[in-house]
Regions:
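A short helix->beta-strand "capping" segment at the edge of beta-propeller domains
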Residues: 13-37
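Surface-exposed loop and turn segments in beta-propeller and other repeat-based domains
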Residues: 24-32, 73-84, 123-131, 167-191, ...
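Structural signature of eukaryotic scaffold interfaces centered on beta-propeller domains
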Residues: 40-43, 90-93, 137-142, 186-201, ...
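Short, conserved, GDST-rich strand-edge loop motifs in beta-rich repeat architectures
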Residues: 265-285
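Beta-propeller blade signature
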Residues: 159-161, 219, 278-286
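Single conserved hydrophobic/aromatic residue that forms the stacking wall/gate
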Residues: 1-6, 10-11
């Protein structure tokens, strides 16, 4: 069904199941080193694997050869000096360069291949405009532009140039919660925190919510915006002292836009279930 979200027209529909399902079988690859505390993202480029450690002690990113997973080096040193990082939210390859988002440090850093071709060196740091409130994900739109979710609640995405300057904002949170849109946009934006991905070959930008079950598909070539809402609905939250406190489920944790399909990782556990598992010491899902 077509709907008007703020001043934006979008196609909104619900889904209850998937017409086709497939089972994936994984194999365990032993590693000769243990450097992780909380491995959260894996990005491949050729025969190099970059693994992001969300809570790294000394470094946030570790490089390995593929397929033998032999250790190469670690980068993204933890610390508060200008060349170190306070946090890492996501990593993205762009050719032979690896871009890294440090939300707490308000910067994007580019690591490029060394002359030996077996390690990465820090080559560029982009300080983000202070109007961008704690960007927690990013995609590379082209060689001069990044797209970062807008957590102010004013819009859906921020377009940022290669110098970190905010170019413009796009879209609006596609919620049916008109009360939150009017009176609690920062809390609404927190609840609608999304993981994003972009495929430059087809112009598709996808966003999936960390809470609830909402998938957004933006076709940046023709400005089409599709919102698909699953059985668990929109992110559920309550407002406490201006913050959005989650009350529903943990939803998606990653999304990948390919040429003919969009893949997303979904959890679906309620916060009550998660609390019970933690009390029992069951941390199978992290």
């Amino acid at each position: 069904a077509q709907c008007l979200v703020g001043s934006e027209m979008c196609i909104r529909d619900r889904y209850t199941d998937f017409p086709e399902t497939e089972n994936l079988i994984a194999c365990i690859l032993p590693m000769d080193t243990a450097v992780f505390r909380f491995p959260f993202r894996i990005k491949m480029q050729g025969d190099t694997v970059a693994i992001m450690d969300l809570h790294g002690m000394d470094h946030f990113i570790h490089l390995f050869h593929y397929p033998d997973l032999s250790y190469i080096t670690s980068l993204g040193k933890r610390g508060d000096s200008p060349e170190e990082m306070l946090s890492v939210e996501n990593i993205r390859w762009n050719g032979n360069s690896l871009w890294v988002l440090d939300a707490n440090g308000l910067k994007l850093t580019r690591f490029g291949l060394a002359l030996s071709n077996d390690s990465l060196l820090r080559e560029e740091a982009v300080s983000l405009d202070k109007e961008i409130l704690r960007g927690l994900d990013f995609v590379i739109y082209d060689d001069s532009t990044f797209i970062i979710p807008d957590y102010s609640g004013e819009s859906r995405f921020c377009w940022v140039d290669r110098t970190g300057r905010l170019l413009h904002k796009m879209g609006i949170i596609p919620t049916t919660n008109e009360e939150a849109l009017k009176h609690a946009r920062p809390a609404l934006a927190q609840a609608w925190r999304s993981f994003i991905d972009y495929n430059p070959r087809n112009g598709i930008l996808a966003a999936v919510t960390q809470l609830g079950e909402v998938l957004e598909i933006y076709n940046l070539k023709d400005s089409t915006h599709i919102v698909r809402v699953g059985l668990h609905g929109e992110p559920e939250f309550k407002v406490a002292e201006g913050y959005g406190i989650p009350t529903g489920i943990m939803g998606f944790s990653d999304v990948q836009v390919m040429d003919t399909a969009i893949y997303a990782v979904f959890q679906g556990d309620t916060f009550e279930d998660i609390s019970r598992k933690m009390q029992k010491g069951d941390m199978t899902d992290g």
